[in-house]
Amino acid sequence: MSGVNEIRSAFLNYFGKDGHEIVPSSPLVPRNDPTLMFTNAGMVQFKNVFTGVEKRANHRATTSQKCVRAGGKHNDLDNVGYTARHHTFFEMLGNFSFGDYFKDHAIELAWNLITKEFGLPKERLLVTVFSEDDEAFALWKKIAGLPDSKIIRIPTSDNFWQMGDTGPCGPCSEIFFDHGDHIPGGPPGSPEEDGDRFIEIWNLVFMQFDQIAPGQRNPLPKPSIDTGMGLERIAAVLQGKHDNYDIDLFQALIRAIAELTGADPKGEHKASLRVIADHLRASSFLIADGVLPSNEGRGYVLRRIMRRAMRHGQLLGATEPLMWRLVWALVREMGQAYPELVRAEPMIEETLRLEETRFRKTLDRGLIILDEKSSTLKKGDMFDGETAFTLYDTYGFPLDLTQDALRNRGISVDIASFTDAMDRQRAKARASWAGSGDTATETVWFGLREQLGATEFLGYETETAEGVVAALVKDGQKVDQLKVGEAGAIVLNQTPFYAESGGQVGDTGVMTGEGVRFRVTETQKKAHDLFVHLGTVEQGTLTPDTALLLEVDHTRRSSIRANHSATHLLHEALRQVLGDHIAQKGSLVAEDRLRFDFVHQKPISADELRRVEDIANEVVLENDEVTTRLMAVDDAREAGARALFGEKYGDEVRVVTMGKSARQHGSNALGWSVELCGGTHVRRTGDIGLISITGESAVASGVRRIEALTGRFARQSANAAIDTAKATAAELRTSVDDMPARVAALMDERKKLERELAEARKKLAMGGGGAAAANGEAGVREVGGVKLLARAVEGIEIKDLKSLVDQGKKQLGSGVIALVATSADGKGSIVVGVTPDLVARFSAVDLVRKASEVLGGKGGGGKPDMAQAGGPDGSKAQAALDAIAEAIGG
C-alpha cells in the first residue's frame, strides 16, 4: 500500500466505510469565487457548507483535493525544486464533518488510520494542540495513549484556524512524524522547530466558534471538522523517504525527464529535474481545468510556472520543446484518479508545445543579455534591478526567471531598484497617455464628468425618454451651440441610448425638440460613465438646456438585444460541447451580426458547431423569460453568475439569467445561463428568433472565434442559401433533395475522366502507343553503351513521374530513365531512375542533381536507384536531360 495511488485509495476508502461520502476533487479554479486565485485546500469546495449557505444531504465527506499554491500569499514557486517539501501542485487528503461528529471521533479516526491502517509506529508520532484546548489534550491522552510530553501545547495562531476576520473558526491539532535524530531539528514549539526532523503530516481543525468581531466569539450550535493531510508528505513517510521528491510518483516523472534529456537524476541538475516534475503537474492540471497561459490573472501564474520549467529544461540541454513530451508519463501516473487529465491530454500537450515554442525565442534572447550583464559578477554580488527591469519590460523576461538563472551562481537581484524602475515606467506611461493626440478631447470629458456627474442610463427600461442638453462639444472643445449641418457631441442629464461597452455597439436614433432635430449616429462612454451622443444637427440650432425627446432606433436595438442574448446562450452551449475550459476573450454585438472569441486550442469540427447551434436554439424555442436584476456582488457569485477573474466589480452588479435549470445552489435556483453583464437583452429567449452560426476561425494562439446571425438576419441568410440551392439544383437539372447525389455522381464522373486523362498523358510520356511503347523502346537512345530514356512531359504530377520511372525501369530491363515535367507556373520537376545492374556505375542522386542545377534548383534527394529534384525554370527541361546524357556518356 506504499504507492501514492494506493495511499490515496486507502485514505478515501477508510473514511468511506465510516459513512463519509467520497466527493471528487473540485476544479483548481474555484467555482463562483473569483476572489480566490486557485483552490488551495480541501475545504474550499465546502466553504458554503461550513458557513451555512449551502446544505448537504450527507453530513460527512472525504476528498483528495488537487491544490495549487503559486500566487498571492500562498506562493511556493521560488522554493520549488530546492527544498524537500515545496510544491506548486499537491493533493490534500481530507475528511469533513458538517455538524456531525466532533473532536473525539475526529481524533479517533485519525489515530486509527495512521497507526493501524498505515502502520506508523506510535513512538515516532507526536501531536500539538492549541494551548487553551484542554479538551483536545485530554482526548489525545485517552484515545492515543500519548504521554504529556508527546502532546505539545502551542499558544500561537499556528494552532488556531480562522476563515476570515469573521465567521467559523477554531483550534487545530497537528500530527507530526519524527524522522529520527540523525536529522537536525527539534519538536514543534522548540527553538529548533524549523529543522526537518519533525514533519507535520496531518492538521485537524475543530470549527467550534463563530467569530463576530476580533476577540468576540460565540460557540457554534453544530461544531464541524475540517482536516488536511498532504498526500505527498504521508507518501514519503510511508515509503521511508525524507524527501517528497523521492516518492514513487515523482521518481516516475523524474525518470521520464531524465530519459528524454540524458540528465543524471542524482547529478548536478537534480534541482532542475524536480522543478520540471513539479511544474509539469501544476501546468497540466491547470490546463485541464480551463486555465490557459496569458498575461493576466490565473493565466499569468500558469505562464510563470510553465516558463520556469522550460528554463530548467534548457539547463538540462533540451534543444526542442520538452514538457509536452512528458504529459503521457503524468497521465500514466495520475490519470486513473483524475479522469479529466485523460480527457484533456491532447489539449495539454498542444498548449505546452505552443507555449514553449514561443518562449524559446524570449528565453534565448534574455539569457544572452543576462550573461553579458552579469559576466563580471561573482558569488554574493547583487545584480542591478534596473537591468532586471529592462529584461522584463523590453524582452519579456520575467523577474523570477532572472532570479532563478542567477541563483545557481549565488547572485541575488536588487529588488528595490527593480521596483523603482517599475514605478517610474508606470508613471511615464501615464504621462505619455496624457500627452497623446486625444488629450484635449479626453480632458473635456473628464472635466464634464466632474462638473455634471455620471449620466443616468434609462435604456434598460425604455427606448424613449425626455432629456435636457447638459453640454455640447465640437472638435474636442466645449461650445455654446451646434448649428444645422454641424457634427458634434451632446451630453444629457439622462439617456435611453446605450453607450458602446462590453462588446455591444452603441445605440443610434434621433433627438427632437422645439424647432431642432439631432441625428445620433454613435453613442460612446467617456470618463468611465459619461454618455456621449455623436451625430449631426439636421434642423435648427442646439444650445445647452434645450429639452429634447430622445428616441432610440427600436428596430436596430431589437436586433442588438437578440445578438447579445445569443452570445450568452452560445457561451454556455460551447461549454457544454467543448468543456468547462471555455472562457470569453472578447465579443462584438452589432445590429447585423455577432462574434464571440473564447479560449480553445484547436479548430471546432462541423459536428461540434452543429451541436452548439442546436443546444442554443433549443433554449430559444423554450421561450423562457430572461431576467435581469441588480445584486450584491457576493450574492451574484453565490447564485452562480459567471465572473471573469481579474475583472473589477463594484458592490452591486447586474446579473442576466436565461433558460431553465434543475441545478440548485443553496436556496438559489440557477438559470441555464447566468452571467454578470451590463448590456441590453431580449425579454424572452424566443425573441432571439433563430441563431445561425456562420463561421469559425482562429484569432490568436489558443483563441477561437465563432460568428453568427440571429432573427431576421439569420432568416435572410437562410433564405439566400435556399435560393442558391434551388438555382444550383436547376442548373444541375435535379431537385434540391437529390442535389447531393447528383453532385457526387458528377464528381465520380470527373474523377474517372481525370484518371483517363492521366493514363493518356502517361502513354504519351512513354512515347505513345504501339509495340515500341509497350516494350519500353519508344524514345530510347544508347549513350556510352547504356540505354537512356529521357523525355520532357507536361501535366504530370511528381507522384505520377515516379510511377512512370518505375514502369520504365521494368520495361527497359537495363538502363537509365529521366523524366522532366513542367508545371503550369513554369517550374520543372525531374525524376531519375537507374536499374539495379547499373547503380554501381551511376547514382540517381548524382544524376538528378546535375539536372536540378540546369533547372535553377539546388540539390535533390533520394536513393541510388531513384531520386527527384526540381527547379524554378522548367523551360530548360531539354537542357537538363542533355546534362544527364552528358554525365552518362562522360
From Swiss-Prot:
Coiled coil (residue ranges): none
SUPFAM superfamilies the record matches: Class II aaRS and biotin synthetases, Putative anticodon-binding domain of alanyl-tRNA synthetase (AlaRS), ThrRS/AlaRS common domain, Translation proteins
Cofactor(s) annotated in UniProt: Zn(2+)
Source species, domain of life: Bacteria
Keyword entries, A-Z: Aminoacyl-tRNA synthetase, ATP-binding, Cytoplasm, Ligase, Metal-binding, Nucleotide-binding, Protein biosynthesis, RNA-binding, tRNA-binding, Zinc
GO biological process, one term: negative regulation of DNA-templated transcription
EC number in record: 6.1.1.7
Cofactor binding mode and count: Binds 1 zinc ion per subunit.
GO MF annotation list: alanine-tRNA ligase activity; aminoacyl-tRNA deacylase activity; ATP binding; tRNA binding; zinc ion binding
GO cellular component: cytosol
Family stated for the protein in its record: Belongs to the class-II aminoacyl-tRNA synthetase family.
Free-text function comment from the UniProt entry: Catalyzes the attachment of alanine to tRNA(Ala) in a two-step reaction: alanine is first activated by ATP to form Ala-AMP and then transferred to the acceptor end of tRNA(Ala). Also edits incorrectly charged Ser-tRNA(Ala) and Gly-tRNA(Ala) via its editing domain.
Entry domain remark: Consists of three domains; the N-terminal catalytic domain, the editing domain and the C-terminal C-Ala domain. The editing domain removes incorrectly charged amino acids, while the C-Ala domain, along with tRNA(Ala), serves as a bridge to cooperatively bring together the editing and aminoacylation centers thus stimulating deacylation of misacylated tRNAs.
Stated name of the protein: Alanine--tRNA ligase
Organism lineage string: Bacteria, Pseudomonadati, Pseudomonadota, Alphaproteobacteria, Hyphomicrobiales
